[in-house]
Amino acid sequence: MFKPVKHLIQQSLCLPLLTLSMVMPASAAAPYQAIDYVDAEFAVSYNQAAAGGTAKLTIRQQHNHYDVNFNIQHSLLKARQQAHFSAKGCDITPQSYSASTEATFKGKSQEKLSFNWADKIATRQDNKDGDTSFQLTQAYYDPISLYFKARCDLMAGKQQLSYPLIYKGKESTHRYQVVGTEKVNTGMGEFEALVVERQRRNKNRRTTFYVAPALDYLIVKIEHRESSLATVSMTLKRMDYRLK
């Protein structure tokens, strides 16, 4: 069934824009380098036509602690995601995550997720679902810190990725696979990108990330296909970044 653009853009907001000199093939390993900061802007399109919205990403690092902000502005939707976590090399430890969405005719939704690793418990607060707690029995991620771990694994040359996380109030596992490479046109030029697909049970839905080795494994495009009639994508317009 066809879904309106505001619904699809809202779905795409669950796909944070991270997580990731010479272009190298997918099987090659690259030495890991941590991110110091990122300022990026993405254009939003619906069925390959401009949707009149932009998404902005900022990443800031201080003493191996990261603050990430992702904002989208659209005539039908305003949304924001924030995350704070620590990183020692590829060991990513989430501390907090929050998300808010305000859509036309749908009101506002708010979610906060806090990780207490000393007591091994995570607490989720949601203005619609109430409070929920989770036992941290393993290295869980939130929807943003997950992509920093994925960037490490892609730089190591991994082809199949799997991560436990707390997502939409539930314990879940997200799986991804590198399916090839593709050239992507962006506001900064053309880049050869690794094509990373999320593995889903519903084959009609498809989420694809395009990760550019030439830009130190940062994402240059995200595409979410809800059905054969509806696809939302976010493509890099500009980016300024630095590695540590």
Which sequence ranges carry the predicted segments?
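Bacterial N-terminal signal peptides
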Residues: S12-V23
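Acidic, serine/threonine-rich low-complexity disordered tracts
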Residues: A29-W117, A156-K244
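Signal peptide processing junction and immediate N-terminal pro/mature segment
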Residues: M24-A28
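N-terminal secretory signal peptides that target proteins for export/translocation
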Residues: M1-L8
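Hydrophobic, well-structured mid-protein blocks that either form specific transmembrane helices
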Residues: G107-D153
